Amino acid sequence: MSAYVIASYDIADPDHYKDYPPAVGPIVGKHGAELLVADMDATPLEGNKRQVYVVLRFESEEAALAWYNDPEYAPVRKIRLDSTANGTAVIAKGFVPPSA
């Protein structure tokens, strides 16, 4: 079952953050993920708007966790964590409707 990493955050240090997008792409690709959303101009409906919204689709929750816990990603993740604020990131499982 597909799993989705959904993240939102504000960029607190643009000079430091600029290193994150080009560094994370190859690691995401290595784990077979598909970038579905990368939006810095999302339309808020409820709650507090964040500057960045990202949705990645992985083959499974295990694949998403393998990416997140990949030692190669650790220093790249640190760039994001050190240069952003108000962040959240979750893994959500895909919905499979019950058979009728």
Question: What is each model feature region?
Answer:
Residues V52-V54, G87-T88:
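Generic beta-strand structural signal
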Residues L65, E72-I91:
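C-terminal structural segments of small proteins and small subunits
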Residues M1-V52, F58-N69, K93-A100:
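Short S/T/G/P-rich N-terminal loop/turn motif that feeds into the first structured element of a domain
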